[in-house]
Amino acid sequence: MEIVLIRHGQPEWMINDEYQKNPGLTELGYIQSTKSARQFTKHSIDQLWVSPLNRAAQTLTPFETNEVAKEIKTFEWLKEMEDKDEVALYGKSSDEIMSFFEKRNSQTFEEWAVSSHGLYMQDFAKNIITNLEGELEKLGIVCIDDTFDKKFEIRNDSLENLMIISHAGTMSVLLSYFLNMPLYAWTWKKFLPRHTGHTRLRSMAISDGHFFRLKEFNNVSFIENPEEQTY
């Protein structure tokens, strides 16, 4: 089984120097999404899951137009992280936004872990994983052991491939889950995906189950112009 993780296209975070809540895509974001979708043929994806936030929903549009997926599902639990401090940023200027994140990103690991954002991330991740496991179980994909690595039972009639269009924070939880890696409040910065880049996980059979390995990370080779490759 293969899982394709895609981050949304470039969002229009700032309009008239005001930070936007639930922004749509920039013109470049639409270009990135179109080029990303062109890499997949009609009905090459069994199921596509997508976040309902505008930037993800608009990234989905060319995938829908090209009929990439046989089935599309929108899930609330795929939304991006948004703690109370981040919510308070909406409507503020670019200078205020930069100042906020510079301060947050300069914390020690110890400070970050016990901060309001660090505690929020624990609940954020738990919600994603609980819902993810529920949906995977419906497809015949169940984690049966994690003593050494996450070992999955994958039914023969389960999907051959799954695509998930979401966000950097959401993707950090998904990657940490499938690859059985520690998840921290800053994990999304360790594995920061480019806009509309392709990250692929492929299951590998062992004697008594399967585990997922990272086959491809952050592939944006389909965006030829380096200036169009953004984070």
Feature names for model-found ranges:
Residues E2-I6, W49, D157-S166, T170:
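Beta-strand elements within well-structured catalytic alpha/beta cores of enzymes
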Residues M1-D46, L53-R55, T61, T65, ...:
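An N-terminal RHG(E/S)-centered segment typical of histidine phosphatases
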Residues F101-N127:
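Short glycine/proline- and acidic residue-enriched helix-loop micro-motifs
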Residues H117-M163, M171:
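Hydrophobic, aromatic-enriched interface-forming segments
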Residues P11, T170-M171:
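Short active-site segment of divalent metal-dependent hydrolases/proteases
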Residues M81-D95, D146-N161, S176-Y231:
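Acidic, low-complexity terminal tails and accessory targeting/binding regions
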